[in-house]
């Protein structure tokens, strides 16, 4: 099964204009596997001003999502995002195990990485590959009273 969305828009932002287009496909590979993503391009234009160095700018945002259900109790999901504005790639991986209704265990791994580490281009000292990362263990229990 295949699904998705296509969206676009034209509008104003502060004293400028914006044109945007987004495509978001989804694929249901099987009962257990779903993959999808989105790509959004936004073009901004602004009038020239004395204190403004850029009058045009294009932003690209790409996202990937995937989910796998091992069975009714265990699932794995992944979310990866790229932004040319931030010059970073972010990733989130999550494993969830549902012991019973209201009792869940999560293992979550997050990572944020730089895509442009060149000191000549950035004007900064060489950036590390990884900007931040975390590993989280979470247990939830809903009390019924």
Each predicted region: which residue ranges?
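Long hydrophobic segments that form regular secondary structure
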Residues: 1-33
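Outer-membrane beta-barrel proteins
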Residues: 29-31, 70-72, 84, 99-101, ...
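Hydrophobic, lipid-facing positions within transmembrane beta-strands of outer-membrane proteins
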Residues: 19-25, 60-66, 89-93, 133-139
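Repeated loop/turn-to-beta-strand initiation elements of outer-membrane beta-barrel proteins
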Residues: 1-6, 32-37, 73-76, 102-105
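Outer-membrane beta-barrel "beta-signal"
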Residues: 93-109, 114, 126-145
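Surface-exposed extracellular loop regions of Gram-negative outer-membrane beta-barrel proteins
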Residues: 24-28, 32-44, 48, 56-75
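Transmembrane beta-strands of outer-membrane beta-barrel pores
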Residues: 8-14, 41-45, 80-86, 97-99, ...
């Amino acid at each position: 099964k295949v699904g998705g969305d296509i969206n676009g828009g034209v509008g104003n932002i502060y004293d400028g204009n914006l044109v945007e287009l987004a495509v978001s496909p989804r694929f249901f590979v099987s009962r257990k596997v779903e993959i999808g993503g989105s790509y959004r391009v936004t073009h901004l234009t602004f009038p020239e001003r004395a204190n403004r160095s850029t009058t045009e700018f294009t932003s690209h945002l790409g996202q990937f999502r995937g989910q796998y259900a091992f069975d009714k109790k265990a699932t794995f999901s992944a979310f990866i995002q790229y932004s040319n504005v931030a010059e970073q790639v972010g990733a989130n991986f999550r494993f969830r195990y549902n012991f019973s209704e209201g009792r869940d265990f999560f293992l979550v791994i997050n990572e944020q990485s730089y895509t442009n580490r060149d000191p000549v281009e950035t004007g900064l000292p060489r950036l590390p590959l990884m900007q931040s990362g975390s590993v989280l263990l979470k247990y939830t229990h809903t009390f019924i009273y």
